[in-house]
């Protein structure tokens, strides 16, 4: 357990040589520590200077200059942690950064744990848990959608919605408990009928947040994309073309890819997590059959399936089997090898695919790939994304808590509809209230908070 009375310090920038490095100090002794090791170019008492001011000078080890620095003084509670905070802008060499940090620790600070600065911001009430998790998402954002979604959550969009629902539930819980304590003066007859539409609206609002979770996950993590097709249709060539490098082995020998290959790439503002699978066909080879079974399993979990067919060969039962497997998923079909003599019946393929879009490609000649990438973007981002109005859940922990809250409300509604006493459905209301509290950290256990903040980088 972290002791908040201790002053903590850490290097806040990447742990490699760079032009500038930053060291952060937070806690009640931050100013006295910097006073001991910093010599301002113009003499002044660093414990008495105004807040949010920058000071030029030198980090000193006794009489020896360690580095020429800028020191930023920020007085709590108007800081990231709500504690007195110092940030030192040093030269970015790891030796000078570690030497400066060593002096700070020698003079009374403790080395911060991963995420401890943000944990203090949470414990001191500056941010809630959903906002703290958004800090990680901002750091890890790999595309513009992920960044905008994380920044929106960091500003408190999720927190605001959750607090609104909790206030509504708390008001109902308080009324019921007061009525149970004082039935002579507080009327409960017919209250269930009054409560039902309120709970229905709460559940609908939670449902709306839950419905955003898949879009939120895709924004944050990328589109889980599985390439399917029978052997030697160009699946590995497609992966290599998208990556711009030979990641997968490409030969004319069917069945070359037996183990799935996984890669992540960003195409403009679209992030794809691509899995190139073994070719699907009827086979007696035990090892190849395992690869085929794995490919079918990957298809079940995919956000997008890219079905690749070979224009130079007639369609066969293997193609038809794959189309049946993928029919209920989001699919883009590629009729590849357009540079060769065409043998596949395009009309038959279109009839089999139905509403599945088909693009004619020659991957080796880079034909059709631009249309393929554009179609992916349209399929997943065609609706206008308004980050001012729409809130996206991007976190599995938050999704789980919201689902539990929704289930508790549904149970309460069912109890009311069946004419159960207030004692029964009040328990469910309190459960829903607690589950919503988990989203923003109002009811979080210490162990869970420790686990969440341990995922942060050092110095954040």
Regions found by a protein language model. Name each.
Residues 288-312:
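Inter-motif core of Ras-like GTPase G domains
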């Amino acid at each position: 357990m972290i002791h908040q009375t201790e002053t903590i310090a850490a290097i806040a920038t990447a742990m490699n040589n760079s032009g500038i490095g930053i060291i952060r100090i937070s806690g009640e002794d931050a100013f006295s520590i910097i006073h001991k090791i910093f010599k301002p170019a113009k003499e002044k008492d660093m414990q008495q200077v105004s807040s949010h001011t920058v000071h030029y000078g030198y980090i000193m080890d006794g009489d020896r200059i360690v580095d020429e620095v800028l020191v930023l003084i920020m007085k709590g509670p108007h800081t990231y942690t709500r504690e007195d905070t110092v940030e030192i802008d040093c030269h970015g060499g790891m030796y000078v950064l570690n030497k400066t940090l060593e002096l700070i620790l020698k003079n009374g600070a403790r080395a911060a744990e991963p995420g401890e600065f943000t944990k203090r911001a949470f414990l001191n009430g500056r941010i809630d848990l959903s906002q703290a998790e958004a800090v990680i998402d901002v750091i890890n954002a790999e595309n513009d959608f992920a960044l905008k979604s994380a920044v929106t959550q960091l500003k408190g969009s999720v927190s605001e919605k959750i607090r609104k629902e909790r206030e509504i539930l708390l008001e109902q819980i308080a009324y019921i408990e007061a009525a149970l304590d004082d039935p002579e003066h507080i009327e409960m007859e017919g209250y269930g009928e009054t409560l039902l539409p309120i709970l229905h609206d709460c559940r609908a609002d939670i449902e709306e947040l839950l419905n955003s979770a898949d879009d939120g996950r895709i924004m944050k993590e990328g589109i889980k994309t599985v390439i399917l097709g029978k052997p030697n249709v160009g699946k590995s060539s497609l992966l290599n073309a998208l990556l711009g490098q030979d990641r997968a082995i490409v030969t004319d020998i069917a069945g070359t890819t037996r183990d799935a290959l996984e890669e992540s790439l960003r195409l403009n503002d679209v992030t794809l997590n691509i899995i190139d699978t073994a070719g699907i066909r009827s086979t007696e080879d035990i090892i190849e059959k395992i690869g085929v079974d794995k490919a079918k399993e990957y298809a079940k979990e995919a956000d997008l399936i890219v079905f690749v067919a070979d224009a130079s060969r007639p369609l066969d039962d293997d193609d038809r089997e794959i189309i049946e497997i993928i029919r209920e998923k989001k699919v883009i079909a590629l009729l590849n090898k357009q540079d060769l003599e065409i043998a596949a019946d395009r009309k038959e393929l279109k009839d089999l695919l139905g509403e599945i879009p088909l693009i004619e490609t020659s991957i080796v000649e880079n034909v059709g790939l631009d249309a393929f990438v554009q179609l992916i973007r349209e399929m997943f981002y065609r609706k206008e994304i308004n980050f001012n109005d729409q809130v996206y859940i991007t976190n599995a922990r938050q999704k789980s808590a919201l689902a539990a809250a929704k289930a508790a409300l549904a149970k309460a509604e069912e109890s009311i509809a069946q004419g159960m006493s207030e004692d029964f459905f009040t328990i469910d209301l309190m459960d829903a209230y607690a589950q919503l509290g988990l989203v923003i950290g109002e009811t979080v256990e210490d162990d869970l908070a420790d686990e969440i903040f341990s995922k942060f980088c050092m110095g954040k």
